[in-house]
Amino acid sequence: MSKRLLKSGIIVSGMTLVSRMLGLVRDVVIAHLIGAGAAADVFLFANRIPNFLRRLFAEGAFSQAFVPVLAEYQKSGDLSKTREFIGKVSGTLGGLVSIVTLLAMVGSPVVAAIFGMGWFTDWLNDGPDAHKFEQASLLLKITFPYLWFVTFVALSGAILNTIGKFGVMSFSPVLLNIAMIATALFLAPRLDNPDLALAIGIFLGGLLQFLFQIPFLKKAGLLVKPKWAWHDEGVAKIRRLMIPALFGVSVSQINLLLDTVIASFLMTGSISWLYYSDRLLEFPLGLFGIAISTVILPTLARHHVNREDNSSQSAVDFRNTMDWGVRMILLLGVPAAIGIAVLAQPMLLVLFMRGSFTLTDVHAASYSLWAFNAGLLSFMLIKILANGYYARQDTKTPVKIGIIAMVSNMGFNVLAIPFSYVGLAIASAMSATLNAYLLYRGLAKEDVYHFSRKSAVFFLKVLGAALAMGGLVWYNCPSIQEWAAMTFLMRIYWLVWLIGLAAVVYLGVLVLLGVRKHHLLTKH
């Protein structure tokens, strides 16, 4: 089983890698086009709302609620009932999201006022940032339809994942990145406001993602006519699971939105610096954390469904799958966190310092990146640990934990006010760590999952190898002034060389410490 999980994880991570690489190219293009000034703040604000919704649906609450229920229908072996269930879910969900999308487009000034209070206050008082509020309202009208597209992308992706077709859903974000890069390069130069072109790119990217998945559903025989069925038993069950899951899974994203509200009161550039640092952190989070979480959820759901046939064995299989997921997060997340800590400024400089993005912006973004990075492992573990609840159709516990984490984040934000925008990143990292701890404590208390002794030994080996890697890379890394003086090709050479050195040292020390291939495959 774990060999199949590892293979699926590699497929998802491979597709995610392509998407994240294009995402970095997209961010490089955006940084060159609009830098980290007022235009960047407005566009990134308008982009954060649909981006939040993408994570909420495509990588979060909807899948967590839908997959376990779909697994029950699939276990019955009745394809016609499964198709009917999918049709009812798509029709009901589609109807609701259509209403929400239309209301949000019409009421975009209200949305902009809620999440950009600082700009709205300036608009009311004819302040210097009044134009930001007006532009944000316009861009939200263009970006909000992405919610409609991404809802069906999440639905079809979850269906395909349950039948082992993980690559389709993992590849679809590539289309969003291509659309945004294309509009930035070819449409933006023809418009007075380049951020308008980027907003159009988000709309087109959502449309392409939606159309891309249809042929795969049809081939699997699961493309069915949507039907409104609010009171259907299966739909009602998803609704009961999803409403709390919307909050529980997305606490970290809600915290980021709260950060955006506060950042709208801070100096120009704050939202942009937080965005670019968050984008670098999203690379390992998506490549490893979300990929592994996506792969193990259907397996965990099946183990839970099969508990009626063999309760004892299913519980063991469930626990082993959780432990395998945690070990994979440690294997990949620990060196990623240490690598980012050492190479934060060089990576920001190589990727973004051109055009309107200056060395000052590199320094500013690096501080928030270091702060966010302190919580990277927690952000990744949350994805795995939350599945331990949602696979068992327990959504109440994560909601309680989510409320605690969100309230704590607000308190941390207040305490971190003296640190300006960096304080927001510190607060997010602290609340994520609290969230992960409480999720684990709950699973352990219910005897669902305990961090095994084998995984503890594995963690110590990983930590030792990662520290050796980080120390050697830090010793060989040029100063930021030397990086700034290099040509672009020389910067690329040095960054690739240091990352290659890190990989060789990390893997070499792991082997010396006794880690072998079977440690990654077995869950027993």
Task: Please give the residue ranges for each predicted region.
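Membrane-embedded alpha-helical bundles of multi-pass transporters/translocases
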Residues: M1-H524
